[in-house]
Amino acid sequence: MNTIDIELKKLPKDVLGWVDYEIAVSNSYDIPVKLLSKKHVWIDRVRCHGYFCSTTPELVVACYMEENEWVQTMVHESCHRDQFIEKTTIWNKKIELDEEKRDPLELMHSWLEHEIELKPRKLKEVLMACMNIELDCEIRAAKKIDEFYLPINHKEYVQKANAYAYLYHILGTTRLWYPKGKSPFYLADVWTKMPTDFDRDYTKIPTKIKNLMLAKCYNKRV
């Protein structure tokens, strides 16, 4: 049921043990794992390095890159799988729109594509629901990195995770994903300015961080 394009036996022992564990957990819930020899994959019209899809279901990671990069992606996406199999409230949250209960990620993508319009209060509800899914996932991922002694810099991971979480506030201003090569969690002059912990109020974005991300990721003068 799995598609493994990489040579797992060449991985460091700790990483191999963890990858085998994640494959086993996924398969125990009838979720295939695809570790593909690709630089990127697509989901919901968005190009990315990996994803977990609950409707298919499948856990997919593009592995044609440095090991420490795709391992980080797999950590993150495996935590989305954990949210799904644990049936967490955050993962299962629906938002009412026009008397229908809708998936917040679906609503966000439709809004970004200008397929629907959302009033300011509803837009914030949608974006915060999406951010909460990712924030919970990142907190889980940071714990998993420590638990399995994965070769990932914990401090840097948390900083990049915070850049990702704050991005959802930025989307409400730009109505655009960042341009190619302008990801806030890859631009060192952005993510290195992020907090090194998750102990903060994510319902709002600090002005300095907002201005930094708009300037560096979207070339917007502030």
Where on the chain are the PLM-derived regions?
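Active-site recognition of the HExxH zinc-binding catalytic motif
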Residues: 72-89
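Auxiliary, metal-adjacent structural segments of Zn-dependent hydrolase domains
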Residues: 1-54, 66-67, 127-129
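Glycine-/proline-rich flexible loop or hinge segments
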Residues: 1, 55-61, 118-123
